[in-house]
Amino acid sequence: MPEGKGGEEGIAAKSVSLGAMVLTKAFLKSDPPLEREMNALSEHIDQTLNRKCPYFPENEPVIGTGGTVAALCAMHNDILLNEIVPKRINGLKLTLFQIESCLEKMRHLTIAQRIERGLESGRSQVMVAGAAVVARLLRHLNASELTVSMSDLLEGALMDFLEGEQHG
């Protein structure tokens, strides 16, 4: 047991350049995206994950943060986007099946149709690529679900630091 960690074995963290805006501009030229564009996007995501994250421990919990995950959670749970607050979605689970179902619905809609269904303008443009990243990542990790968190990684690092200051 690592000293001072209360039995924690360690946490895996990895940053990979798979931003939804960059991927949208690079791969999703049509509105709605064409099948070949979606296939190329998925292939790129898979290749990037295989190259940058060749190993990840099985059965580890996956925490999803950020706007795409929050929007997917809201869509699946019929939460209006203006009602997305940490108290409402933190700790909720999203399964791979639920994420892929949302992606399948969105990929056949135009940006305007996504906006009509409640996505804000900026998010509606990148949501398909963002959801594809989340889905492909869960597949890569052999994970069946993720836990939604509106706290981001920087906030988590700050909290860990502050807790260490208080107990150190």
Question: Where do the language-model regions lie?
Answer:
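Helical "lid/coupling" subdomains associated with nucleotide-phosphate turnover
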Residues: 3-168
